[in-house]
Design a protein with these regions (language model features):
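A detector for small-residue-rich transmembrane helices and their helix-helix packing motifs
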Residues: 1-189
């Protein structure tokens, strides 16, 4: 978290070349062997609002997840979500030389969805709407909106990263703790 905040602030306020250097550009990812951008772009955010929103979400879900599954598994989950989201983005945008992406949203979506599997009775809120939403319903709405926005929106948000990061989080739990899904089904049934 500290590294992400530090690099992002440095890029936003002091060295904008850092942001340009580590943008994830699917078209150039393989052509120019920009493999480091798959991870580095997830450590840098384009602006203060993007950074604050992602770090706020990270704060509320990452620390409980780390305590629950342990530091090693948490780090694997986080980076698996980051890589999964970038691979999906690469696949969709690999022929688009204009496309670029930045931020940790895919990794954070992976953490969020793993959290929902482990803690399905939790209520979540969407900022700034102060209405508690059951975690499972939140997940359905999140996926539905992200899918719709991926197909219909021009808002400079990588909605595919949200979808693929969420899928990565669900796959991670399925691979490392399949019994979590049995507990989830018992609770929501």
């Amino acid at each position: 978290m500290g590294l992400t905040i530090g690099l992002s602030l440095l890029g936003i306020y002091r060295l904008p070349d850092i942001i340009n250097r580590f943008l994830f550009r699917p078209y150039y990812f393989v052509r120019d062997r920009q493999y480091d951008t798959m991870v580095m772009s997830g450590l840098i955010h384009a602006d203060l609002g993007h950074l604050l929103f992602n770090m706020f979400t990270f704060y509320f879900f990452a620390f409980p997840m780390e305590r629950y599954i342990g530091t090693t598994r948490f780090l694997i989950l986080y980076f698996f979500g980051l890589v999964t989201s970038h691979l999906c983005t690469w696949y969709k945008q690999r022929n688009n030389p204009e496309y670029a992406s930045l931020g940790a949203s895919g990794a954070i979506s992976a953490v969020l969805f793993a959290y929902i599997v482990y803690f399905p009775t939790t209520s979540l809120m969407i900022i700034p709407i102060p209405i508690p939403i059951p975690a499972v319903l939140f997940a359905v709405g999140y996926v539905g909106y992200s899918y719709w926005a991926s197909a219909n929106s021009n808002d400079r948000i990588n909605h595919d990263a949200h979808l693929c990061g969420a899928s990565g989080g669900l796959a991670f739990v399925a691979a490392t703790d399949p019994s979590a899904y049995a507990r989830l089904m018992t609770i929501i049934a």
